[in-house]
Structures are given as C-alpha cells and as structure tokens.
UniProtKB/Swiss-Prot annotation:
Protein's cellular compartments: Membrane
Compositionally biased region (Basic residues): 98-110
Pfam annotation, one family: Pkinase
Reaction it catalyzes: L-seryl-[protein] + ATP = O-phospho-L-seryl-[protein] + ADP + H(+); L-threonyl-[protein] + ATP = O-phospho-L-threonyl-[protein] + ADP + H(+)
Residue numbers bearing the Phosphoserine modification: S318, S585
Positions of region (Autoinhibitory domain): 418-448
Lipid addition sites, N-myristoyl glycine: G2
Gene for this chain: CRK8
Organism: Arabidopsis thaliana
Active-site residues from the entry: D278
Protein name per the record: CDPK-related kinase 8
One GO cellular component term noted in the UniProt record for this chain: membrane
Sections of the chain in a coiled coil: none
InterPro entries: CDPK_Ser/Thr_kinases, EF-hand-dom_pair, Kinase-like_dom_sf, Prot_kinase_dom, Protein_kinase_ATP_BS, Ser/Thr_kinase_AS
Binding positions for Ca(2+) 4 per the UniProt entry: D581, K583
Length: 606
C-alpha cells in the first residue's frame, strides 16, 4: 500500500476539448454562478479575431477595471496587476514559448503606445475617469520623507494602477542601497476598498518580509500625490523569461528547485494566514542573472488574510491560473495551490493545461475540462511527476494537496530530503471538525486512520512534531499556542488564527497523542483520491465493525449528524443502518466519514 498514487482521471480516455491540436469554437456563453458579476465581453472577444489574450490581468476585469472596459464607475479591487498582453496568432499553439517571445519583442512598443493613448483597446472603448467616493481619507500614516531619503531612477515596470522604478537610499541605515520602489498614485484610489487594498498590501509585505523566497520589504512612504513602497530590487528577471529562454520546457530535475521555492514561500504565507491569489510566472523574480539565483514572490496587491475556517468570495487573479472554486466564489488557500499546479504543468511540458480563445472560454475549460497527460512529453515523464501535478490540479479543492503536503510528495522528497516543512494551517480545520464530531464519526475516523499509507503517515508525523508535543508525547492547547507563537508574524494576528485556536476547546483539559492526531488530521477526500481507496475503506470498515460500530436508531443517528427536523430522516438515512442488527452499514460508514455535522461546520464567507 505504500506505493499508492492518486487515481487517474475518469475521463483520461476522452479527448480533451481544450487540449492542443483540437479545433476551438468561440465560447462566449459561459458565466460564473453569479451572473450579476460575470465577465463582460471585450471588443476582441465579441467576434472572431486573430487576437487572443495569453496573460490577462484578471478573470474579473469588469470588477477591477470597469472604467477601462465599459466606461463605468466600478470599484477597483487591485492597484497592481499585469498589463494585458495580446498575441497575434489565429491558431491554438502547442507551446506558449514561440508567441510569448513575439509578445515580449513587442512589449516595449506596446507600452509606448499605451502611454500615448493609441492602443486598439482605448480607441474602441472610450475611457472615463472613475467617480471618486466622497470623504475618502487617503492618509496612511507612512513616512513623508521619501524625496529627502530616496533618489528615484528609471521606470522598470508598469501596471494598471501603478508603476515601479529603480531607486537608491540617500541617507539612513539603508544609505547606498539600490531598491525597487512601487509608486501608486492616490488619484487612482477612488474607493475605500482601493485604499484598504494598499494598506493591506503594505501590512502583508511588512509582516512576511524576511522569508528567503519573498521579496524584501524596506519601507513605505507617502506624500499628497503617491504612496511609495520600497522593496528589494530583483535583477534576474521574471520566471516567465527563464521559461521562454528554455523554449518553454524544463526537465524534471530542473523544474523541481523552481517548484520547491514556490511551494516554500506559499506554504509560509498560508501558515501565516495569507492567500496570495495571483500566483503566476510573472510574479516570481530571480535575484540575479545567475542560473541558481533565488526566486522571490512579488506583487501582494491582491493578497488577503484568511482564517482556516473562512472562505473568500471575490473573483481576482489571472485567467489562466484561476482555480475553479474562485469562479464559484467560495475559496481559501487551496486556490493558490491550483495556480502552482498550472505553473508546474507549464514548466514540465511547455503548454498551458487550460486554453480557449476568450476569457469566458478559459473559465469554462478550468471548470469543465481535464488537463491532458497523454501528449508528449507526459508519456516520457515519471509517474511521480504526473501524480504530483494531478494532485495539485484536482478540481475539488478538498482533494487537492496543500502547499506543505506538496513539499512532502515523493517526487519532491526524492530530490531534497532535508527541507524544513512549514506547519499546514488547514490541519486545524480538520482537528476542529474532529473535535466537534459525534462519537460514532470519531470511531470511524480512527478506523480509517489505521489504513493510512506510508507517505501520509510521514507527513502527519512531521506536522505532529511541529506542534511540539510534551514529554508524554501529547499535544495540548498550550503546546499548540507555543508552537504557533514561536513562528508567528503580525500577519497571523491579522488573519485571526489565534482566535481560531479557541475553537479547539476540546483540547483545553486533555492531550492528543499521535494515534488520535492521525484520526483528527486525516483528510478523507484526499485519501479517497488514492488508487488504493477501495481496499482501504473496506479494511477500515472491518476494523470499525469490530471496535466502534454499535446499534443505533435512525433518530439518534440524525441527532448525532445534526440533521434538522425538516429533513425526512427515515427516507434519507434508511440505508445508513444495517437491518440485521441495527448497526451502521458500510454505506452509512462511508457517508459518515464524508459528512460533517451541522455542529462541526460553521464556516464563514466574506
């Protein structure tokens, strides 16, 4: 059982309608679940056109940029985003490399055209200034000594709502330090949300700065016109540029260190309660031109704080990297892991896993299509590499690996066995559900935990040790608090993770050993994705039948599950109970493992 991998896709034998080499009809009729905020067609998407976006600034640019797209006065969710890049090609490419190179060659000219206001987009869609909300306070409390302390250099980058320049500190502790300064005009901050976005970006950078794979934050300044964010200057270029230099393809051993660095910083962010929400190759920079230079995550303009039991609902990010649950407006940190899966797919094969001619078509592909693992080079890559990418790209976020788990996947672990694995904050969500579960479900989870495979046990042992068990080998509320406090940043306080710990009050007066921790932390949906699930669940039921099963009437079962009085329990739960002896049936056992009682839910959405 130690060799279990994830189940192959049930549709792997079918042709992927969005895979390279197929014909692509124009798809404009897709909309997310909330049609009131569905994407607004752009002029280039309204008819057949040789233009299609390769990297779009956001899957919801109608929300973030209405003034540009439809002349409206919509709110801007982000002040920094990647400019729209359009590529002049009519047919679906097998690899992004060739025409991205063409786009890069044209980038300078397009920037100049954008600055002069003569791009195709601006000539077809007149722009209007967004109306500013009344009574906005644009004071941030940052230092106002920017011009006396910093000497600005040339512009090195530009987004929709700001631009970046090289600069040098003229005095103070950082005298002589060359930095990058992100400049955000206050005239662009036309809503309270936009102002809060800037404030939150600075908070996140300040709190998380210091991680080796995250851009170093130095200081924030403001004057009457702008906000200035001084950060580390990374001179090695974007990860995207390195991908292009290799012709859009990495070997497995070359891809691993890139993916490890991305996973490291994302796992750290998630541990601190921060979700990035815009992970893509453009948002990772190398510190120098050297081949083995460090990779740094940048652009936290769309990032947010999130608790383990909290879900976000605003659509942000970049179309090719956006997770299905983001389009459904209910997501958490797993959405970042999906984006890493897309990056890993591109690194290993040079193509995007989801493609269409229009933004709405991309969204449909993300929601409905399965990425192809049949075309070269996938048949020639290792089974571990394919399993790794597939487990990052499960459409059901409950089955998807976390960033910490991905660092312990056999494909990664075989490359580097001496990594510091961050604590997986989502384990607290599993523990909360376990502690609030009925005694019957706890017994079922304990039985299932006896069937864990070697890789799962190794991962849980690592996570258990990070919670600093006491001399008796038990974790308690005190050991958990101390373990978190030793690694906490201000971001963890902002995301209210310490408050969430109060929900683990079942550990207030007792400890939890490793055996019970396995039952509490096991992810049933992830375990189900393994190809040994059928064998595992049958064996677990046998153990449960011997040690935990008992006679139970339907009304008691309904009460334990938290089923309300409006539910016809006899018809719903009839098959859950074995008619011969009144004990839980195999069907009921499986359902009980998957089901979470009303008492164990209580997740919040914002």
């Amino acid at each position: 059982m130690g060799g279990c991998t994830s189940k192959p896709s049930t549709s792997s034998g079918r042709p992927n309608p969005f895979a390279p080499g197929n014909d692509y009809p124009q798809i404009d009729d897709f909309a997310p679940d909330h049609p009131g905020k569905s994407p607004i067609p752009t002029p280039s998407a309204a008819k057949a056109s040789p233009f299609f976006p390769f990297y779009t600034p956001s899957p919801a640019r109608h929300r973030r940029n209405k003034s540009r797209d439809v002349g409206g006065g919509g709110e801007s969710k982000s002040l920094t985003s990647t400019p729209l890049r359009q590529l002049r090609r009519a047919f679906h490419p097998p690899s992004p490399a060739k025409h991205i190179r063409a786009a890069l060659r044209r980038r300078k000219g397009k920037k100049e055209a954008a600055l002069s206001g003569v791009t195709q987009l601006t000539t077809e869609v007149p722009q209007r200034e967004e109306e500013e909300e009344v009574g906005l306070d644009k004071r941030f409390g940052f230092s106002k000594e920017f011009h006396s302390r910093v000497e600005l250099g040339e512009e090195i980058g530009r987004g929709h709502f700001g631009y970046t320049c090289s600069a040098k500190f003229k005095k103070g502790e950082l005298k002589g330090q060359v930095v990058a300064v992100k400049i955000i005009p206050k005239s662009k901050m036309t809503t309270a949300i936009a102002i809060e976005d800037v404030r939150r970006e600075v908070k996140i950078l300040q709190a998380l700065s210091g991680h080796k794979n995250l851009v170093q934050f130095y200081d924030a300044f403001e004057d009457n016109a702008n906000v200035y964010i001084a950060m580390e200057l990374c001179e090695g270029g974007e990860l995207l540029d390195r991908i292009l230099a290799r012709g859009g393809k990495y070997s497995e051993n070359d891809a691993k260190p890139v993916i490890i660095q991305i996973l490291n910083v994302v796992a750290f962010c998630h541990f601190q309660g921060v979700v990035h929400r815009d992970l893509k190759p453009e948002n990772f920079l190398y510190t120098s031109k050297e081949e083995n230079s460090q990779l740094k995550a940048i652009d936290f303009g769309l990032s947010d704080f999130v608790r383990p039991d909290e879900r976000l609902n605003d659509i942000v990010g970049s179309a090719y990297y956006v997770a299905p649950e983001v389009l459904h407006r209910s997501y958490t940190t797993e959405a970042d892991v999906w984006s890493i899966g897309v990056i890993a797919y591109i690194l290993l094969c040079g193509s995007r896993p989801f493609w269409a001619r229009t933004e709405s078509g991309i969204f449909r592909a993300v929601l409905k299509a399965d990425p192809s693992f049949d075309e070269p080079p996938w048949p020639f890559l290792s089974s571990d590499a394919k399993d790794f990418v597939k487990r990052l790209l499960f459409k059901d976020p409950r089955r998807r690996m976390s960033a910490s788990q991905a660092l312990m996947h056999p494909w990664i672990r075989a490359y580097n066995t001496d990594m510091n694995i961050p604590f997986d904050i989502l384990i607290f969500r599993q523990m909360k559900a376990y502690l609030r579960s009925s005694s019957l479900r706890k017994a079922a989870l304990r039985a299932l935990s006896k069937t864990l495979i070697k890789d799962e046990i190794l991962y849980l042992k690592t996570q258990f040790s990070l919670l600093a068990p006491n001399k008796d080998g038990l974790i308690t509320m005190d050991t958990i608090r101390m373990a978190l406090a030793s690694n906490a940043t201000e971001a963890m306080k902002e995301s209210r993770i310490p408050e969430f710990l109060a929900l683990l009050n079942g550990l207030q007066y007792r400890g939890m050993d490793f055996e019970e921790f396995c039952a509490a932390a096991i992810n049933v949906h992830q375990h189900e994705s393994l190809d040994c699930w059928e064998q595992s669940i049958r064996h677990a039921y046998e153990l449960f039948d011997k040690n935990g099963n008992r006679a139970i009437v339907i009304e008691e079962l309904a009460s334990e599950l938290g089923v309300g009085p409006s539910i016809p329990v006899h018809s719903v739960l009839h098959d859950w109970i074995r008619h011969t002896d009144g004990k839980l049936s195999f069907f009921g056992f499986v359902k009980l493992l998957h089901g979470v009682s009303v008492r164990a839910s209580g997740k919040t959405t914002r």
